[in-house]
């Protein structure tokens, strides 16, 4: 079986006039078996972000690919969530889980870039993370990876939040 052809240049997230970055993660051909035969359709997975810490994931199904993608984009815009970032990276190492997928996300110094695979890369690009190291363990299903990545990003706490929980000052936390 031949390997799928890969793009040499990284794909940039498509930016709309409202300032949102959109990225299509996966499109699957699906079939529904009925008495008269098979009905072909498409399922799309997309992520939308503002490049400043907001992220949304959407799924859409339809008989045609463009309609499925449009439905997924609309759902992603409705399900936006805010995550805490620190100058293009995360504050600390976090683990995200969904189903059989575990994702480890680590902060990285300036100039590192996004070192992450497929579906995780799309999430980081639209959310506004520019320097990060991430690794997925377990299932590599794009749906699970996107959900686990968003789960991990939602667990990131700022130093101020950690200091408030511990009853200390931010200076004491950062040592």
Curated annotation (Swiss-Prot):
S5 DRBM domain span: 20-83
Gene Ontology MF term list: rRNA binding; structural constituent of ribosome
UniProt keyword annotation of Transcription regulation present: no
Keyword terms: Ribonucleoprotein, Ribosomal protein, RNA-binding, rRNA-binding
Domain of life from the UniProt record: Bacteria
Pfam families: Ribosomal_S5, Ribosomal_S5_C
Region named Disordered: 1-21
Gene3D superfamilies named among the record's database cross-references: 3.30.160.20, 3.30.230.10
GO annotation (BP), single: translation
Keyword Ribosomal protein attached: yes
One of the record's GO cellular component terms: small ribosomal subunit
Complexes and interactors: Part of the 30S ribosomal subunit. Contacts proteins S4 and S8.
Domain remark from Swiss-Prot or TrEMBL: The N-terminal domain interacts with the head of the 30S subunit; the C-terminal domain interacts with the body and contacts protein S4. The interaction surface between S4 and S5 is involved in control of translational fidelity.
HAMAP family reported for this sequence: Ribosomal_uS5_B
Function statement: With S4 and S12 plays an important role in translational accuracy. Located at the back of the 30S subunit body where it stabilizes the conformation of the head with respect to the body.
NCBIfam families associated with the record: rpsE_bact
Family recorded in the similarity comment: Belongs to the universal ribosomal protein uS5 family.
Name the record gives this protein: Small ribosomal subunit protein uS5
Organism from which the protein derives: Dechloromonas aromatica (strain RCB)
Lineage: Bacteria, Pseudomonadati, Pseudomonadota, Betaproteobacteria, Rhodocyclales
């Amino acid at each position: 079986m031949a390997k799928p052809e890969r793009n040499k240049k990284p794909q940039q997230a498509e930016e709309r006039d409202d300032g949102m970055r959109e990225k299509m993660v996966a499109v699957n051909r699906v079939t529904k078996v009925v008495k008269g035969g098979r009905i072909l359709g498409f399922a799309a997975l997309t992520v939308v972000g503002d490049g400043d810490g907001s992220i949304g994931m959407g799924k859409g199904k339809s008989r045609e690919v463009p309609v499925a993608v449009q439905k997924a984009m609309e759902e992603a815009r409705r399900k936006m969530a805010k995550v805490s970032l620190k100058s293009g990276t995360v504050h600390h190492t976090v683990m995200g889980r969904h189903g059989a997928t575990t994702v480890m996300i680590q902060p990285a110094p300036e100039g590192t870039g996004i070192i992450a695979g497929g579906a995780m890369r799309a999430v980081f690009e639209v959310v506004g993370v520019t320097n990060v190291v991430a690794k997925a363990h377990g299932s590599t299903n794009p749906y699970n990876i996107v959900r686990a990545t968003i789960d991990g990003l939602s667990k990131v706490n700022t130093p101020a939040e950690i200091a408030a929980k511990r009853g200390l000052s931010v200076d004491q936390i950062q040592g």
